[in-house]
Amino acid sequence: MHMSRAEKARKKRHKRRLGTIATVITCLLVVGVGGSYAFVQMHPKVTANEITMNDESTTSRKANIVVDPHASTKAKIEATLKANQFNGTAYIVKDNQVILNQGFGIANKTIGKMTDDKSLYIIGSMQKAVVATAIMQLQEKGLLNVEDPINKYFPDFPNGKNIKIKNFLGHTSGINGRKKGNQPITSEQILRDIEAGGIYRQPGKWDYRDDNYAVMGRLIEVLTNQTLTNYLKQHIFTPARMTQTGIGDGFFTNPNEAVSYKLSNSTLIKNPYLQDNSQLFGAGNMYMPPKDIYLFDKALTSGKLISQASLTRMLQPGAGDYGFGFYDRNTFYISRGVIYNYETINSFSRNHKDAIILFSNIRSEKGNATLTKEIYGLLQ
């Protein structure tokens, strides 16, 4: 059967229309699939695991926010110090954590320098605890025994057969002592002056005298063939990491010196240094920042400097509640120094976890010993 020419033309046009429609449909399908793929790529499905991970990340960020558990206590201590016109540096430890290491007030009026954690102070009689530690070290080495009479080492010492080393350490020797001058002096001459001063009673009764520790300082030198300064540097300062501690005149040229002042009619007046530092041998010519005496305490109580047995003997209270260099105040141990107008306090709790260290270059009316008791109350 033959189609006419017109029918053939209509059939070709119909095929072309079908082809065009198929092409359009194919394009639409391609665009739809591609758009869906792009949407999935731009907006991926969030799984349950990923939601959990995001929640954990948020929680972790919250956990990293540090809250100071001692902030309230620190604020109360600062307020107490300021209310009592404390001028110096305070170093406070609670549960082996330093919660305050801060200066309050003036260090050097002339140059307008304020006290801070690096300020240096002459520590006065607080030095006796350091010297007593050195004596206990020598006992552990077998070079002496605290029960030995002093004439075993210094044959010319008055009443030397009855006065024991422990009597000097505990201020029960009965010596008269000497009158300090203001000129340089050697440790040998200091000992001769003390011997010449004689005794005023038999040993055993409490009588606090610096010269007891001058004798101990000289004993350390004789037994070790070192100066007291060199022995302490090698066997106490270095192992305890007391890097800013010194002895003698270096204090007065150190830029961190906290100058001693006294108040007169509300005016600060520089307190005069009346004696050459060598006159304070063994008993009061050491200087340091508060942090260094804390490092000493930790080295002392942790066994780094002496044994536990030696520490127990050193802290055992005798006459005047005084052991060897420390007073026993029932809930804490304390050593104290007062010289010129410096007042320094070093104390730590019986469990060795808390410490209150107050170094002043201007003595307050209340005094650091009373402040120490108040601050211990705040630490409870």
Question: Model regions: which residues?
Answer:
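Catalytic-site signature segments of enzymes, centered on catalytic residues
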Residues: 179-250, 280, 284
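Catalytic loop of the DD-peptidase/beta-lactamase superfamily, centered on the K-T-G motif
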Residues: 2-98, 274-380
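Soluble non-cytosolic domains of exported or imported proteins
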Residues: 67-71, 87, 117, 121, ...
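Short active-site loop at a secondary-structure junction
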Residues: 84-89, 111-167, 200-209, 281-284, ...
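Extracytoplasmic/secreted proteins, especially bacterial periplasmic and envelope-associated proteins
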Residues: 72-76, 99, 130, 134, ...
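Short glycine/serine- and small hydrophobic-enriched flexible loop segments
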Residues: 136-141, 217-222, 295-301
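Active-site helix/loop module of the DD-peptidase/beta-lactamase fold
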Residues: 122-126, 138-175, 222-260
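Amphipathic coiled-coil signal-relay and dimerization helices
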Residues: 98-104
